[in-house]
Amino acid sequence: MAMWLKNGMSFNENGQLVRTHIKIEHGNIAAIHHEQLFEANGEDVIDVGGKLIAPGLIDVHVHLREPGGEAKETIETGTLAAAKGGFTTVAAMPNTNPVPDRKEQMEWLARRIQETAHVRVLPYASITLGQKGEELTDFAALKEAGAFAFTDDGVGVQSAGMMFEAMKRAAALDMAIVAHCEDDTLKNGGAVHDGDFARRYGIAGIPSVCEAVHIARDVLLAEATGCHYHVCHISTKESVRVVRDAKRAGICVTAEVTPHHLLLCDEDIPRLDANYKMNPPLRSRADREALIEGLLDGTIDFIATDHAPHTAAEKAKGMEAAPFGIVGLETAFPLLYTHFVKKNVFTLKQLVDWLTIKPAQCFGLQTGRLEVGAPADITVIDLETEEPIDPETFASKGNNTPFAGWRCQGWPVMTFVGGTLVWEKGRA
């Protein structure tokens, strides 16, 4: 049955925020009316009361932990967290147990997603068997089984020869290589950034060059192979410079940045709180400023959360022993809206684009836009109500966030996937 969302606000084709009414039918957007009145002909009508109607948000960097890490997260809980955060499409990283490195595992994952996911899930396949960096997977078979792209995220592919061959195979299949960039010989056994915080507490630090050197190697390999090479969670000013230079040279490279690297630097870490431990680590203030500049000038293409849930017991082990990672799906939009749009650093249109159409364009997705005929993946967002971030209310199994207590506006209140309401604020 058809349905209308009425009295919302969305961006028209000229980038202006205007009153909007959207008709949803057969899972797609059937009509969009701006300003003018419309008459419902027996269809259900939801009055969104002037709230923002945005395309469903897209996150291409999420750890759902299943299979093997169900104590931290499952496909069901992680995708419910995604829906609560306004995300209608997420891409699931392959650092699970077992790793989706064979056709049979990819097929199992596809079935599990079909059975339990609340939103669309795009599964990554690994570049190497077991993510061990020793032997390449069967890219063609994994693509046939539904792989979204190839990555060994969580570790960097250390062998240049291995990465070169991976890029050649990916390019032949018109698939992307998505890279976690760390040179293991430069990691220094670090738990935080190699900066003032590390020196103050006597903790081994991860130097910026560890990431930038790896990216520099890979962009040259991408140039040689013609592969689409995507940089995960870029974090340093040197890395931004390398990607900027590569784009100017016409190399097919894209990059993402996380909300936490835009919002925080190592100066913000209070004592030895492991909820501030992630990889890459929070870098310097100069790095943070370079990331913001890189996002604004197009060097960095979009924002992705790197949602990485862990148990409370794991994070209680302290800064050096606790695992890397924080959750992000339920806090990304409110944090970015409150601390960048409300402060006139970003425009609302820029923020929405970085979380929707930009990742969709980078990876050739059909979602991420409000257009007649497009899938009705839609998020309704309340830009006015201010609430604190409360980890105890998270849908995710993980509550490992450095943003507890931060007061934010810009909270999603309804999320639709293919025209179906999958989450609504206040509804059990």
Curated annotation (Swiss-Prot):
Regions that span the bilayer: none
Residues the entry annotates as binding substrate: 63-65, 95, 279, 310, 324-325
E.C. numbers: 3.5.2.3
Cofactor note: Binds 2 Zn(2+) ions per subunit.
Record-level GO BP terms: 'de novo' UMP biosynthetic process; purine nucleobase catabolic process
Reactions accelerated catalytically: (S)-dihydroorotate + H2O = N-carbamoyl-L-aspartate + H(+)
Active site, per annotation: 306
Domain of life: Bacteria
GO terms assigned for molecular function: allantoinase activity; dihydroorotase activity; zinc ion binding
Alphabetical UniProt keywords: Hydrolase, Metal-binding, Pyrimidine biosynthesis, Zinc
Database matches in Pfam families: Amidohydro_1
Binding sites annotated in the UniProt record for Zn(2+) 2: 153, 180, 233
Binding annotation for Zn(2+) 1: 61, 63, 153, 306
UniProt keyword annotation of Metal-binding present: yes
Function: Catalyzes the reversible cyclization of carbamoyl aspartate to dihydroorotate.
Family to which the UniProt record says this protein belongs: Belongs to the metallo-dependent hydrolases superfamily. DHOase family. Class I DHOase subfamily.
Alphabetized HAMAP family for the sequence: PyrC_classI_B
Protein name: Dihydroorotase
The organism's taxonomic lineage, starting at the top: Bacteria, Bacillati, Bacillota, Bacilli, Bacillales
